[in-house]
C-alpha cells in the first residue's frame, strides 16, 4: 500500500515533504486538502494529526506529522539514494541545524511579511518586514556551496525554497515594495532561479499558483 500524503496547496511545510517524496521517488497517494473547506478539521484528519495541520503522512498504518520529522523519517524508511540528508555525521548535523534555523528565524521573518501584506498592513510594516527578511537572508548567502545549500541538493533546499517562494508570491501580489531593489543576495537569488527550474519543483508547484 502506497504511503498516504496529506497536503494543502501553498503550504510551504507541506510542499517540502512533497518535494522530498518526489525527489526520492517514493510511491504515494496525494490527498490535497482545502483550508477553506475545513478539511483539516474533520474527525478523520484530526485522528491522523490532532493539531489539524499539514503535512501529515500515513505509512502502513503509522501516522506521522511535522514536516521536519517527516523528512527524517523518509530517509530512515527509504535510505536509498538520492538522500535528503548526508550520510556524513558532520554534514548531516549542519543540514539539521540549517533546517531549524529556517523553521525558527526565516519563519519569524516570514510572519512579519504576512502581517505587512495583510489588509491592515502599513508601509512602515512593509519596510520593517523587508529589513527583517533581508537581514535574515543575508545570513544564508555564505551557505551556498555550488548549486545548492550545504552542498548537494538536500532537505535544506526543500525546506527554504517553498518558504521564500511564498514570500515572493505574496509580495508580488500585495506589496511589490517588499521586493523592490531585491530581497535576497546575488547567490541566493541565483539559487532560487535554479530551484524553480528543477523538474521536481515544477511537478509539485502549488496547484492554485498555476
Enumerate the language-model features and the residues they cover.
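GST-like domain detector, emphasizing the conserved glutathione-binding G-site
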Residues: 1-130, 134, 148
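Terminal-tail/helix-coil boundary detector
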Residues: 203-210
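Active-site-flanking alpha-helical
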Residues: 75, 163-164, 205
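GST-like fold's C-terminal all-alpha helical module
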Residues: 98, 102-197
Amino acid at each position: 500500500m502506497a504511503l498516504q500524503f496529506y497536503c494543502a496547496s501553498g503550504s510551504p511545510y507541506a510542499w517540502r515533504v512533497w518535494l522530498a517524496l518526489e525527489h526520492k521517488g517514493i510511491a504515494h497517494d496525494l490527498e490535497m486538502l482545502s483550508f477553506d473547506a475545513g478539511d483539516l478539521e474533520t474527525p478523520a484528519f484530526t485522528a491522523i494529526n490532532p493539531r489539524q495541520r499539514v503535512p501529515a503522512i500515513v505509512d502502513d498504518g503509522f501516522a506521522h506529522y511535522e514536516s521536519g520529522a517527516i523528512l527524517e523519517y523518509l530517509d530512515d524508511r527509504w535510505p536509498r539514494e538520492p538522500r535528503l540528508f548526508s550520510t556524513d555525521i558532520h554534514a548531516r548535523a549542519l543540514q539539521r541545524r540549517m533546517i531549524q534555523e529556517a523553521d525558527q528565524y526565516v519563519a519569524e521573518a516570514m510572519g512579519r511579511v504576512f502581517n505587512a501584506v495583510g489588509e491592515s498592513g502599513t508601509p512602515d510594516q512593509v519596510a520593517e518586514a523587508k529589513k527583517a527578511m533581508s537581514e535574515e537572508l543575508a545570513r544564508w548567502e555564505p551557505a551556498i556551496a555550488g548549486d545548492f545549500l550545504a552542498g548537494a541538493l538536500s532537505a535544506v533546499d526543500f525546506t527554504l525554497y517553498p518558504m521564500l517562494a511564498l514570500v515572493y508570491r505574496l509580495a508580488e501580489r500585495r506589496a511589490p515594495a517588499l521586493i523592490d531593489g531585491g530581497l535576497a543576495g546575488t547567490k541566493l537569488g541565483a539559487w532560487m532561479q535554479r530551484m524553480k527550474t528543477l523538474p521536481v519543483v515544477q511537478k509539485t508547484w502549488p496547484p492554485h499558483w498555476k
